[in-house]
């Protein structure tokens, strides 16, 4: 089962976004929602925040709002399921070039970092493995390519980068959403 089975298809989501004049690709929108979830936003405040970031604070029309709720729910479910089902929402198919996928990946990562940053304002202070992954994501967001490159080689490299980004997103989710262990409740001795 893939996450695409639970959300509208990429082209359908693109149509909804274009109808609303949202100015984001489906990959960018998924990156933004994923970043917000991975940053620890797991309540209903994601919708107004999304509206503020993408639509000048205005709610989206019914079709797009419903599609975004499905995207949010499917993404959240995939991340909570130990991340095994979580996949980046990128264009696929024979008519999609490796360059289109590379551009979509850069957009996904940029918006993931935005979503992560609005939920974790001290992102630049994160250290350790997660801090390194965030630094790597910043570099990947600047992804560039030469159109004269061997497309087959570029496709293989792109798949490796996509998998790295997926794992980095899961690491962020684990870092920012796991329950912090609390001290066991100290029971006072009872006098009988």
Swiss-Prot record:
Identify the stretch annotated as signal peptide in this record. Answer: none
Question: Membrane-crossing residues?
Answer: none
GO cellular component terms, semicolon-separated? cytosol
SUPFAM superfamilies on file: YgfB-like
Record's superkingdom? Bacteria
Q: Belongs to which family?
A: Belongs to the UPF0149 family.
Q: Kindly provide the name given to this protein in its UniProt entry.
A: UPF0149 protein YgfB
Organism of origin: Salmonella typhi
